[in-house]
Curated annotation (Swiss-Prot):
<keyword id="KW-0325">Glycoprotein</keyword>
<comment type="function">
    <text>Lipid-transfer protein that may be regulated by the transcription factor UDT1 in developing anthers and play a role in tapetum development.</text>
</comment>
<dbReference type="InterPro" id="IPR036312">
    <property type="entry name" value="Bifun_inhib/LTP/seed_sf"/>
</dbReference>
<feature type="disulfide bond">
    <location>
        <begin position="34"/>
        <end position="72"/>
    </location>
</feature>
<keyword id="KW-0732">Signal</keyword>
<dbReference type="Pfam" id="PF00234">
    <property type="entry name" value="Tryp_alpha_amyl"/>
</dbReference>
<dbReference type="InterPro" id="IPR016140">
    <property type="entry name" value="Bifunc_inhib/LTP/seed_store"/>
</dbReference>
<keyword id="KW-0446">Lipid-binding</keyword>
<comment type="similarity">
    <text>Belongs to the plant LTP family.</text>
</comment>
<feature type="glycosylation site" description="N-linked (GlcNAc...) asparagine">
    <location>
        <position position="91"/>
    </location>
</feature>
<protein>
    <recommendedName>
        <fullName>Non-specific lipid-transfer protein C4</fullName>
    </recommendedName>
</protein>
<feature type="signal peptide">
    <location>
        <begin position="1"/>
        <end position="26"/>
    </location>
</feature>
<feature type="disulfide bond">
    <location>
        <begin position="44"/>
        <end position="59"/>
    </location>
</feature>
<keyword id="KW-1015">Disulfide bond</keyword>
<feature type="disulfide bond">
    <location>
        <begin position="70"/>
        <end position="92"/>
    </location>
</feature>
<dbReference type="GO" id="GO:0008289">
    <property type="term" value="F:lipid binding"/>
</dbReference>
<feature type="disulfide bond">
    <location>
        <begin position="60"/>
        <end position="85"/>
    </location>
</feature>
Length: 94
């Protein structure tokens, strides 16, 4: 059961990354350059679940290759998801 939940979480994370890439492209303003950068983050999907070990070298390389503009755009899109889905903002502070 735990492995199933882990696989589901990894799949959900991968889906979010792909959606962010598509969203960045749809927003225009050079978003097309972000798509390949964000797609490379799929190498990080195993790390993006609670309890994961250290990220792989491939993940770290992918993360280091993302431009600041693409990273900020992806974070902005991710932060807007709850309100766009008519949900409360997620507060992760303790």
């Amino acid at each position: 059961m735990a492995a199933s939940k882990g696989n589901a979480a990894a799949a959900a994370c991968a889906l979010v990354l792909v959606l962010l890439a598509v969203g960045a492209e749809a927003q225009g303003g050079g978003g097309g350059e972000c798509v390949p950068q964000l797609n490379r983050l799929l190498a990080c999907r195993a790390y993006a679940v609670p309890g994961a070990g250290d990220p792989s070298a491939e993940c770290c390389s992918a993360l280091s290759s993302i431009s600041q503009g693409c990273a900020c755009s992806a974070i902005s899109i991710m932060n807007s998801l709850p309100s766009r889905c008519h949900l409360s903002q997620i507060n992760c502070s303790a």
